[in-house]
Amino acid sequence: MQDDGKVILRFRDGHTERATLAVIDAAREVLDATPDQDGGSEEVPFSALKAVFFPRMVPVEQLEEPHGSLIAVEFADGEVIRGTATYNPEASGFFLFPLDRSKNERIFVVRDAIASIEVEKL
């Protein structure tokens, strides 16, 4: 997948920040990012995050075909996003490829920000 590291961080308290992502460290449950407005790199704990949105940078036709199950993710704040993912409940997060990829190519969902997950029938 092509990307330039530009992401949108969505926090559990409701605010969002545009940033450049350096790395998602699932083992330590943190990510390293540089907020667009600050310019300084910071470590963001998963406990503060809801999800990380990766804006679409290429035409939809050029996006990689997602693999996994069709699921509906409901966050603690009531937002529901449907998409394709390979979900492992043991992992601290997972990538969700939204059904509507016109804005976001993929979303990193933080497991502890989820209220429920439903596997949808085809």
Label every PLM stretch briefly:
Residues 1-122:
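Conserved RNA-binding domains used in RNP assembly and mRNA/RNA metabolism
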